[in-house]
């Protein structure tokens, strides 16, 4: 039995396996869902049985699998829990300033603590920084230097405004770093936007500490008024009250001005002495005065505006008058220079400036130049301020109040110190043994330089040149064949109606040594021979008169008294706007404008004229001073300026010297083009797409032609400026400079392709045959050959002149023909316009007639249809006509029956009803009533219907 049981058991297991594998009973060919579930359970059961068997046999594998699963679950849980922290947390901030620094460093952004300490100090400077900002790091040393100098008066606080957990980062939203805010007690913040330099920061802080400048004396008043900055003066009496009414408002207005303009363009001063106040027309305490150099100075209108700090600053800023402006580019993208250059020609002065210095001699000279340049009416107040700037002693002032412009000077007020020059009239054939020598003097008016300040009676170059021009126009008046006396004549200048010239002339022979008319005190008596006199006169001719700058250096004291410069801004169409820049900070701009990079003194002056697309520089070898500035401005202001346009170019050292094609720059242009060779110059730029395709052509050309007689060169005109006469309007352009005829340069035809054969033909056609090397075996030409060649040349010249004359006549005839054709074209154009207007009128009338014709056609069709209907109606008998005939016949019968015997009542009753019904009027469009027969038939039909 055990075997059966065993076999049976075995058979049972096999049957289960068979069912699991087959998915159903033996012999079944398809799988059912119940069989699939049983199969899955069988697999799981067998897997668990195998795992338990393996665990019993090798328990260490089970423990390892369990440990590995736990580790995977732990790692997955840890990763998912840290999924939000994808940014590394910021490191805690550290101190930005050292512990020994005078700056209080709140590196954790404690803005509330900064507000707390600000309440205990009168002046506080807050420095907001970001630790990673390079500009903040660079400004750190400057802030420390300024704080060390002002630590006993000002509290400097640095705040880290970048740490994300600090209050500064949460409450302040700055777009740049560093940021400097200044608080003066409860007033602020005043933001500083100037250069991050210690001296400028200290100057700004000191300006905020003392916004008002005390004026105790007349000298201090002149210092205040002669400054280039606009000045506002307030008069307050402190005798009756320690704080007069309006003083605090005036004090706040000075701080308000500094808040609006960190440069402190408008200065504020206080006068407490009533005598000083009267000099500027201030009488009542609390009045405010705005000084202006050239326009009428103003007093604050209390009756029009409220006396508030903002109104005072607004009034001063709207009415201020500036001599020149300080420019401080911040180094980034800015329209500062562009906006100023749009206003007109600009004079840029780069000077080393120390804001903390008490005196600025060079700045005083520039101020003096600006005052004279704009002093158009010779104002006495401006003259007094100029004397103060020159440190010239002057009498005590009576008043600095503005006065009305003086009337034009009379002839008696002409200056008593004319300037003279000796000239010689051109001699003619009849006067070969005599010469007319004249002393030409320019009489100056009071509107120019005062005689008291004139040290040398010498005119400027321009005045003497104008006098010579007017003199030579009237030289026939001064010719005398033989005259022993001195004759003088006065004539007005054509340039100014308020000045005139005096010419005193005398005829002398060649042997005369000197003039004898010393009693006139006009002519000098030089003891020289006429030959030397003639040489000296030739030296003083207009073409040989030294340049104005040379003249000023020859007579330096004359520059102080020149009348040509005073009020020049009102006598020229090229008025300059003057701008100053600190060369210690912005020397890079000066280098880009033409200043040398290795200048021993960083002083530079340049004039930029955007409209004329040119700029001029003052010679760096000349010192920047009043004389040179006046000469520089005068030379620019004349109509035909002697200044040379500054040209910028590439560095010639970067190009190799030994090359087939010579690279030309601005500095080497004249050297290359003026060689004793034929020079072919190509104009190109880097952005010209067609220019590089010509390189192989010019390389082949340079290889074909000999180097000793021909030069192939090129110039990049985008990097190198050239004089106007050598500029071109298209690229590429080829210019040819012949060897011995450099003034006859030729441009390659623009409509001719630039190819090697065309270039060779062009060069051979325009080259100089004389420049080619001659064969030593050929003998020189004979005299007859030279004479015949000269005759041929003269004939050729006469032929060319005749051809030119014919061309001129043809041009004149063509011009007349052109004028006639233009007149005819104009009349034809007028006729065309007139015909066009007539055509438009006719077209409009035609459209009106067409619309009228269409209306008539529609009306015609309508009437035609009506006529057809009438004709149709007249041809067809209408039912109304028949009904009328019956009615007439009936009435006739009734009339006939009235005279006969009476009929029975029913018949008589029926007739009136019938007649009544018959008497009803029917319109032509109505339906005729039915006849009697039809009525009877209708009644019978109804009766039959009712019966049925």
From Swiss-Prot:
The keyword Phosphoprotein is assigned to this record: yes
Main localisation: endoplasmic reticulum
Thioredoxin domain sequence ranges: 88-214, 618-768
Residue ranges with Gly residues bias: 1-13
Positions in coiled-coil regions: 793-874
Subunit structure as annotated in this protein's UniProt entry: Interacts with the cytoplasmic part of DUOX1 and DUOX2. Interacts with TPO and CYBA.
Protein name: Thioredoxin domain-containing protein 11
Species per Swiss-Prot/TrEMBL record: Mus musculus
């Amino acid at each position: 039995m055990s075997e059966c049981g065993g076999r049976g058991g075995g058979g049972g297991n096999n049957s289960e396996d068979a069912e699991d594998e087959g998915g159903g009973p033996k012999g079944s060919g398809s799988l059912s869902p119940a069989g699939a579930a049983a199969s899955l359970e069988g697999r799981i059961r067998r897997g668990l049985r195998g795992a338990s068997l393996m665990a019993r046999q090798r328990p260490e594998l089970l423990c390892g699998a369990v440990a590995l699963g736990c580790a995977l679950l732990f790692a997955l849980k840890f990763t998912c829990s840290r999924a939000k922290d994808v940014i590394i947390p910021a490191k805690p901030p550290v101190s930005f300033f050292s512990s020994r620094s005078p700056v209080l460093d709140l590196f954790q952004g404690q803005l509330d603590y900064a507000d707390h300490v600000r309440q205990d100090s009168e002046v506080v400077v807050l420095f907001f920084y970001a630790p990673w900002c390079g500009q903040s790091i660079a400004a750190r040393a400057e802030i420390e230097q300024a704080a060390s100098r002002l630590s006993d008066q000002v509290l400097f606080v640095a705040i880290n405004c970048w740490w994300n957990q600090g209050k500064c980062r949460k409450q302040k939203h700055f777009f740049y770093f560093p940021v400097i805010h200044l608080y003066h007690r409860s007033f602020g913040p005043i933001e500083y936007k100037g250069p991050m330099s210690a001296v400028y920061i200290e100057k700004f802080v000191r300006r905020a500490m003392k916004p008002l400048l005390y004026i105790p004396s007349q000298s201090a008043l002149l210092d205040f008024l002669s400054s280039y900055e606009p000045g506002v003066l307030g008069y307050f009496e402190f005798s009756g009250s320690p704080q007069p009414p309006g003083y605090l408002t005036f004090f706040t207005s000075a701080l308000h001005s500094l808040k609006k303009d960190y440069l402190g363009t408008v200065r504020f001063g206080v006068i407490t002495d009533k005598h000083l106040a009267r000099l500027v027309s201030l009488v009542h305490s609390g009045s405010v005065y705005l000084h202006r150099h050239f326009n009428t100075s103003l007093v604050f209108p209390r009756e029009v505006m409220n006396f508030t700090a903002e109104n005072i600053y607004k009034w001063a800023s709207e009415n201020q008058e500036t001599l020149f402006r300080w420019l401080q580019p911040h180094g980034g993208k800015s329209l500062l220079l562009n906006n100023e250059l749009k206003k007109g020609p600009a004079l840029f002065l780069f000077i080393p400036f120390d804001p903390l210095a008490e005196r600025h001699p060079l700045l005083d000279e520039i101020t003096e130049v600006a005052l004279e340049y704009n002093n158009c009416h010779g104002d006495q107040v401006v003259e007094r301020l100029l004397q103060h700037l020159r440190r010239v002693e002057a009498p005590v002032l009576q008043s600095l109040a503005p006065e009305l412009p003086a009337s034009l000077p009379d002839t008696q007020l002409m200056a008593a110190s004319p300037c003279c020059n000796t000239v010689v009239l051109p001699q003619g054939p009849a006067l070969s043994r005599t010469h007319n020598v004249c002393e030409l003097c320019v009489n100056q008016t009071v509107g120019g330089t005062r005689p008291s300040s004139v040290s040398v009676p010498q005119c400027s170059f321009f005045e003497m040149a104008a006098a010579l021009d007017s003199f030579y126009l009237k030289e026939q008046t001064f010719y005398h064949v033989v005259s022993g006396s001195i004759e003088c004549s006065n004539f007005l200048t054509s340039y100014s109606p308020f000045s005139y010239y005096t010419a005193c002339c005398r005829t002398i022979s060649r042997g005369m040594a000197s003039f004898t008319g010393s009693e006139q005190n006009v002519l000098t008596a030089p003891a020289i021979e006429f030959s030397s006199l003639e040489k000296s006169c030739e030296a003083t001719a207009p073409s040989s008169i030294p340049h104005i700058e040379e003249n000023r250096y020859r007579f330096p004291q004359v520059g102080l008294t020149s009348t040509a410069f005073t009020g020049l801004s009102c006598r020229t169409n090229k008025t300059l706007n003057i701008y100053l820049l600190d060369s210690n900070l912005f020397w890079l701009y000066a280098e880009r404008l033409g200043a040398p990079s290795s200048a021993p003194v960083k002083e530079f002056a340049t004039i930029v004229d955007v409209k004329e697309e040119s700029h001029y520089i003052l010679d760096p070898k000349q010192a920047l001073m009043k004389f040179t500035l006046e000469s520089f401005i005068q030379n620019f202001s004349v109509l035909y300026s002697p200044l040379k346009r500054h040209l910028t170019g590439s560095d010639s050292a970067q190009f190799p010297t030994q090359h087939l094609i010579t690279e030309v720059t601005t500095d080497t242009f004249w050297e290359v083009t003026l060689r004793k060779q034929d020079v072919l110059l190509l104009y190109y730029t880097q952005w010209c797409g067609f220019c590089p395709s010509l390189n192989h052509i010019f390389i082949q050309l340079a290889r074909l032609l000999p180097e000793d007689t021909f030069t192939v060169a090129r110039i990049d005109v985008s990097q190198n400026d050239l004089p106007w006469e050598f500029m071109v309007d298209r690229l590429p352009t080829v210019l040819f400079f012949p060897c011995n005829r450099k003034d006859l340069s030729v441009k390659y035809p623009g409509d001719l392709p630039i190819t090697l054969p065309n270039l060779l033909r062009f060069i051979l056609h325009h080259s100089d045959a004389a420049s080619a090397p001659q064969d030593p075996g050929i003998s020189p030409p004979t005299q007859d050959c030279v004479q015949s060649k000269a005759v041929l040349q003269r004939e050729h010249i006469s032929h060319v002149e005749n051809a030119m004359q014919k061309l001129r006549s043809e041009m004149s005839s063509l011009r007349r023909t052109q004028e006639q054709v233009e007149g005819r074209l104009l009349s034809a154009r007028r006729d065309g316009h007139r015909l066009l207007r007539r055509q438009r009128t006719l077209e409009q009338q035609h459209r009106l007639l067409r619309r009228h014709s269409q209306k008539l056609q529609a009306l015609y069709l309508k009437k035609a249809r009506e006529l057809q209907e009438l004709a149709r109606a007249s041809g067809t008998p209408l039912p109304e006509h028949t009904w009328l005939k019956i009615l007439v016949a009936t009435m006739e019968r009734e009339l006939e029956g009235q005279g006969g015997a009476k009929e029975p009542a029913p018949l008589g009753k029926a007739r009136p009803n019938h007649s009544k019904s018959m008497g009803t009027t029917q319109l032509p469009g109505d339906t005729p009533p039915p006849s009697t027969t039809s009525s009877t038939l209708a009644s019978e039909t109804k009766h039959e219907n009712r019966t049925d």
